[in-house]
Amino acid sequence: MQEQYRPEEIESKVQLHWDEKRTFEVTEDESKEKYYCLSMLPYPSGRLHMGHVRNYTIGDVVARYQRMLGKNVLQPIGWDAFGLPAEGAAVKNNTAPAPWTYDNIAYMKNQLKTLGFGYDWSREIATCTPEYYRWEQKFFTELYKKGLVYKKTSAVNWCPNDQTVLANEQVIDGCCWRCDTKVERKEIPQWFIKITAYADELLRDLDKLDHWPDTVKTMQRNWIGRSEGVEITFDVKGYDNTLTVYTTRPDTFMGATYLAVAAGHPLAQKAAANNAELAAFIDECRNTKVAEAEMATMEKKGVDTGFKATHPLTGEEIPVWAANFVLMEYGTGAVMAVPGHDQRDYEFASKYGLTIKPVILAADGSEPDLSEQALTEKGVLFNSGEFDGLAFEAAFNAIADKLAEKGVGERKVNYRLRDWGVSRQRYWGAPIPMVTLEDGTVLPTPEDQLPVILPEDVVMDGITSPIKADPEWAKTTVNGMPALRETDTFDTFMESSWYYARYTCPQYQEGMLDSKAANYWLPVDIYIGGIEHAIMHLLYFRFFHKLMRDAGMVTSDEPAKQLLCQGMVLADAFYYVGENGERNWVSPVDAIVERDEKGRIVKAKDAAGHELVYTGMSKMSKSKNNGIDPQVMVERYGADTVRLFMMFASPADMTLEWQESGVEGANRFIKRVWKLVYEHTAKGPVAALNVDALSEDQKALRRDVHKTIAKVTDDIGRRQTFNTAIAAIMELMNKLAKAPQEGEQDRALLQEALQAVVRMLNPFTPHVCFTLWQELGGEGDIDNAPWPVADEQAMVENTTLVVVQVNGKVRGKITVAVDATEEQVRERAGQEHLVAKYLDGVTVRKVIYVPGKLLNLVVG
């Protein structure tokens, strides 16, 4: 064994060994308990960032630990390879998205290997390959036949200059990112999957997810947004149709003083024909983004349509307004307004001088003061005719029943969740497998024509999708009849909604999944990824699992038993102000800093002499230039050091502050372990450990070893507090470094301890542990070694610490045998000099003894 720890030599050698031995390749084995450990697959952007490294290190630690417990562990990896960034990069680099993507995959795969992640590379998937997306296309056609897929018009961002659809990210301050033209909202036909058909089950089954963070479950509950209410129909004078609204507060119905419809509603469109102000308003709304966050804060505007609706219970005529806060995509595109008891309705009514009628009493029974705001709390009705005096629930039921009796209302359960729009007017995605015949009939692509392959050898102009620009690509025949292919592609959330299941059978050619393999491995035991995916990916992931279950492919109801959301990685951020007042962000690597005595940054400059402004720690990002390149750190310290720091610096679900001093500390610790093993093995063969022959000091050290094994096992396995597991190993290492190493049993005990330490560290620092295990004479590869088991007998305490008080004040602590009598404890206390001086020349009047814990001597 060489004296110096040289990670650059060890790591490449161990990685080659894993590759050659195919150490982490697994197959189904009914005789073993399975464990499926999965980290969210990366987008091949070009280089790994520290967020990736943290995510995948957590996954690898869990997988290696479970493997050492003797389980059959699947840990696969792949690439979420379709998406908009590839199109932008292709235009910028004058290439096509496919070669750019495949080059990035090759580069990042090598990066993952240098970090020593124990993946089963035989199961690698790239979602942009026809071998993968063909099954997604086939499944989509089956969902269409089941009635779970439909097409309808929906609003998109449209650039009138480029004549193209823009993604939300391509709209900058309401203008096209390329040509700065004002972006419009345009209705175009798009494909949808009926996720709403599963809304109730998606909501209900959240209760089964005991090992998912409550924050994620709450976000999904709110996103699904189940509500119980009443759907009410209004007659409108001079309009051919009725208006239908939904309300969760029918108790306030007698206070409805106007209706509001979306600018795109047919009623508003009809009214606009003779109303120039309304027509201009509708035009303005067409260019308004409809993101919910913006809807909440934007100014509420409207125009009176001139139509009057009849209140079904009072017979009063109430005005119908077109308003920018009502969306056609939500509900019926019309809402009932009760300004006395809804703040948004109140602000709108106040702005336009509309009637505000209170119908709910304040909590103290008085009429509410509506001079400044609406009363939104529930309460007792007044001003409501026959319903006066009823509280919320009774009023809800009475008014709902009355509306039903008159044939103008029915109770409804509503969901905030909308069907999933899967059409994207982009090129780099899986083609949607639908065709349109010359007579307008829409059909799924026949199975013998699947997959519909996306051409990869294309020229990107940055404006139009190559498959939209090429009329020949769309031409096909179905049953001998000419047809045109759909030129939209799938939302990339489609690919990431089922990849975890395909990992169980990536080479299977008979269908989307091999049910036998899928049901052996699924559900995933632990899924690791960022909380930013809480409502989009993680909801579609659950939805797709239920779709596959109902297609007979899987038997479980949910895709993953446990979800671990890792925290973000933060780093110092610095900038200097340029000549034009702009902020120039400087990498923390290039910042020369001065710190105060507490280690806080007080001054900073860069190599060019710019005085830097320090903004504190923030998420590593390109925009602040504060990302740390993992590759540079691996080359400087080794992968094991980077991994150890990542797991030690913070609990897995909390933010991690990148500090190079902490990385150096992790490196020093590995060197200490290396040094101790080197010194130990240099002394030659070790005798067998004889636990019966150990001295009290040796037994105490062995007790520490086995207590550490028990703690680390619990910290990794049950609590998943990986940082405290590492801290416990570090504490034990400090004791081992100070322990005697000369006697035969000293060395035998150290051998047992070091073999345990190396196995406990193996999930975190697998390269160095692989090497040290061999040096310590461990059997076989450490990758196949069992996890150390704590010896219960060794952990039994034969001594205990007793606190000694004199007149209730702590005067000392003594170590006594666990079975010591009160007399023996008193005698031992009297020998303790810190205690003895308080007993000199006084009489002990009373003794209070709590066995094994406390001795209080009352003196006078």
Curated annotation (Swiss-Prot):
Keywords: Aminoacyl-tRNA synthetase, ATP-binding, Cytoplasm, Ligase, Nucleotide-binding, Protein biosynthesis. GO terms for biological process: leucyl-tRNA aminoacylation. ATP binds at K622. It catalyses: tRNA(Leu) + L-leucine + ATP = L-leucyl-tRNA(Leu) + AMP + diphosphate. It holds the Pfam family tRNA-synt_1. PROSITE patterns: AA_TRNA_LIGASE_I. A motif ('HIGH' region) lies at residues 42-52. This is Leucine--tRNA ligase. It comes from Salmonella enteritidis PT4 (strain P125109). The gene is leuS.
